[in-house]
Amino acid sequence: MVTQNKKILIITGSFGNGHLQVTQSVVNQFKEMNLDNLTVIEHDLFLEAHPILTSICKKWYINSFKYFRNMYKAFYYSQPDQLDKCFYKYYGLNKLMNLLLKEKPDLILLTFPTPVMSVLTEQFDMNIPIATVMTDYRMQKNWITPFSQRYYLATEELKDEFASIGIPKDKLKVTGIPISDKFETDIDKTAWLSQNHLDPDKPTILMSAGAFGVSKGFGQMIQEILNRSPHAQVVMICGKNKDLKRSLTSQFKDFNNVLILGYTKHMNEWMASSQLMITKPGGITISEALTRQIPMIFLDPAPGQELENAVYFEEKGYGRIANTPEAAIEQVAALTNAPTKLASMSESMDASRIPYSTYKLCKDLLNLLNHSSHYEEVYGKVPLYAKLFVK
């Protein structure tokens, strides 16, 4: 309950859709709570601060998974002191200062790694409560913000990792990664598959091709999966890759056990109705799959957060890593021909998932808000030279 007017500023980023999805889940949850005294605003800090440079960086980021893996690996695994000397630490400083002094939020929620926040907390003594939502399953130094009052984490293991570098445990909350509440609702799998002209009695393999950013090789992969698992059916989600959808639709037009889709708003229904999923191990996608208890095969995860997520899920028994399409086909055949193994993996996921993670996170944020200082006590401390940043 918010008894006086309060404002939350969410800092997000559009490097991949996951951070935006987390932000939207939090915003929607607060709307459902119907809190008259709460204002929630969101800003893509880097895009707003440096639109052209950010656009270039985003293209590099996307292509790094395909062409510059070693470069991205070096950045991801670089030491904290190396990052501290990097310009990236100051990226967006002017825009952030403008936002804070104009909007005067009572709490800042980071859904994207924002190293520049440490510049404000360390140098400008702006005592605003800061909370961080980590959207992956292994610790990474970019998420560490000095003086952050709360870190919302996916697992107890991740909590132990944060505690091992000296972050007090009372600042660490295991809420799970925020996802839409629709992944908690019951789905009639038989009805869903039937209305999409698929057989409810066949094991359904869900492939999310849009996550890979490439168009080649999927036709052969689907054909080999069907050859090795003739009792199964395949649903291929092509995302916004229209060329891939057109090509695969033509190739499999006479197959009643293959469904080719483009962009869909029904990943929830497809996850709920499938027995196995081939995907990239993005933090949000695998959190949704964990909630839906659908085991996964991670095809060629890139070094960095993808690989770390995949290794964690494989260690827990929720999925398997396949570094090549051939290995993925072998894994699909092995699992679809061993339904008890698939069922065991699904049961492990059900026992480990954290339901209603977004609601739990938002309830804790409200608790932080109710104990935050009045904005005049916070922003009155800002030195004059800092206020000169404001335009």
Swiss-Prot record:
It comes from the Bacteria. The keyword Transmembrane does not apply. Pathway: Glycolipid metabolism; diglucosyl-diacylglycerol biosynthesis. Keywords: Carbohydrate metabolism, Cell membrane, Glycosyltransferase, Lipid biosynthesis, Lipid metabolism, Membrane, Transferase. It catalyses: a 1,2-diacyl-3-O-(beta-D-glucopyranosyl)-sn-glycerol + UDP-alpha-D-glucose = a 1,2-diacyl-3-O-(beta-D-Glc-(1->6)-beta-D-Glc)-sn-glycerol + UDP + H(+); a 1,2-diacyl-sn-glycerol + UDP-alpha-D-glucose = a 1,2-diacyl-3-O-(beta-D-glucopyranosyl)-sn-glycerol + UDP + H(+). Its EC number is 2.4.1.315. Its main location: membrane. It is found in: Cell membrane. One of its GO terms (molecular function) is 1,2-diacylglycerol 3-glucosyltransferase activity. GO terms for biological process: enterobacterial common antigen biosynthetic process; glycolipid biosynthetic process; lipoteichoic acid biosynthetic process. GO terms for cellular component: plasma membrane. Processive glucosyltransferase involved in the biosynthesis of both the bilayer- and non-bilayer-forming membrane glucolipids. Is able to successively transfer two glucosyl residues to diacylglycerol (DAG), thereby catalyzing the formation of beta-monoglucosyl-DAG (3-O-(beta-D-glucopyranosyl)-1,2-diacyl-sn-glycerol) and beta-diglucosyl-DAG (3-O-(beta-D-glucopyranosyl-beta-(1->6)-D-glucopyranosyl)-1,2-diacyl-sn-glycerol). Beta-diglucosyl-DAG is the predominant glycolipid found in Bacillales and is also used as a membrane anchor for lipoteichoic acid (LTA). Belongs to the glycosyltransferase 28 family. UgtP subfamily. NCBIfam families: PRK13608.1. This is Processive diacylglycerol beta-glucosyltransferase. It comes from Staphylococcus saprophyticus subsp. saprophyticus (strain ATCC 15305 / DSM 20229 / NCIMB 8711 / NCTC 7292 / S-41).
